């Protein structure tokens, strides 16, 4: 028989940050995992003098990778070669090997990680899970192959997820829809444990400013622990959340100002003549946020022309007459890539005296 004692739990990141919230971890004084601010320009002045200010609250709910094949591992140990081999549905076999070496006190030559076809990864399979080390230890002890395949129910409660952010944001514009300032607060639900630090909300807080000209910006970010599955990168790694917040704010402003949604974006996009454009922010690799090339207004115009944006209202009305409802939306997204600064090299010296550099 198993006796269960119900314990207090928090499932809402906002409630988790309340002073009287039950701590997720025993001995912890609160559930605030981390907090930071991002800012440039004078937001107070921008909002104090702005003809228009639009405020919105967003909850971006949780989601997961939910690949066709769940996670799985097979571990074997060859005592003759003193070689531990782990076949794992991991997206990061080199990281997994290094972690196994660190945890088991083994040299890299004594650990091999093989990543076969994954059946879908999408981010959650970047993570090193307890099952990875558990199977490795079991194979070393038993001297037998050990296999574990995650079922779908386990996947929903044991594999990391993403999103789950609460935004309170406001945008200041002039009478023509030009952005004067952006500010707000972001609460990020981190789940019960941390596997990737602050990188997800950090990316969200950077991406919300792209690819528009924003003279002043301020965002307060808090990471909350909750009694939920941990949060790690999934398909975009924090960046879609920032895009969603900005694009919805622009839709709201366009509606209130009587502007076409595409036009308000065109008026605020960074122009090709201003490239490369350095944003006064720091990416998570420590370098500056640089929009290195492109003509964003032209890119938007080309896409809208191919999509038939100007002709869509006529199509919409024709469909409405037939009892059908058609809608169209748009968004601009600049994907951050090439982050650093980090490189690696391996030098191997064989007994024969030859040197191999990788």
Where are each of the predicted segments found?
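Structural alpha/beta core scaffold segments of enzyme domains
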Residues: 1-358
């Amino acid at each position: 028989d198993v006796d269960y004692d119900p314990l207090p739990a928090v499932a809402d990141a906002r409630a988790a940050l309340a002073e009287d919230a039950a701590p997720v971890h025993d001995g912890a004084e609160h559930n605030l995992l981390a907090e930071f601010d991002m800012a440039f320009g004078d937001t107070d002045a921008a909002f104090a003098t702005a003809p228009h200010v639009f405020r919105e609250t967003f909850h971006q709910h949780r989601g997961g990778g939910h690949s066709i094949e769940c996670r799985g591992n097979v571990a074997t140990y060859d005592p003759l070669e003193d070689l531990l081999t782990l076949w794992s549905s991991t997206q990061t076999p080199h990281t997994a090997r290094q972690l196994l070496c660190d945890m088991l006190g083994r040299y890299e030559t004594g650990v091999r990680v093989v990543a076969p076809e994954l059946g879908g990864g999408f981010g959650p399979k970047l993570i090193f899970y307890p099952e990875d080390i558990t199977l490795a230890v079991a194979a070393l002890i038993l001297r037998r192959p050990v296999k574990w395949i995650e079922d779908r129910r386990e996947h929903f409660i044991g594999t990391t997820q993403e999103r789950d952010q609460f935004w309170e944001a406001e945008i200041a514009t002039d009478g023509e829809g030009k952005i004067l300032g952006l500010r707000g607060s972001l609460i990020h639900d981190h789940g019960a444990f941390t596997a990737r630090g602050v990188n997800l909300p950090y990316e969200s807080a950077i991406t919300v400013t792209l690819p528009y000209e924003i003279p002043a910006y301020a965002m307060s970010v808090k990471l909350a622990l909750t009694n939920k599955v941990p949060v790690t990168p999934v398909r975009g790694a924090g960046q879609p959340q920032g895009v969603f917040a900005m694009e919805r704010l622009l839709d709201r402003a366009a509606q209130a100002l009587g502007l076409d949604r595409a036009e308000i974006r065109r008026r605020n996009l960074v122009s090709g003549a201003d490239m490369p454009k350095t944003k006064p922010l720091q990416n998570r690799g420590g370098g500056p946020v640089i929009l290195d090339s492109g003509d964003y207004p032209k890119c938007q115009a080309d896409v809208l022309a191919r999509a038939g944006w100007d002709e869509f209202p006529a199509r919409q009305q024709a469909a409405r007459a037939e009892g059908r409802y058609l809608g169209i939306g748009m968004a601009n997204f600049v994907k951050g890539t090439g982050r650093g600064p980090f490189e690696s090299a391996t030098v191997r010296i064989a007994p024969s005296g030859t040197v191999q550099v990788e």
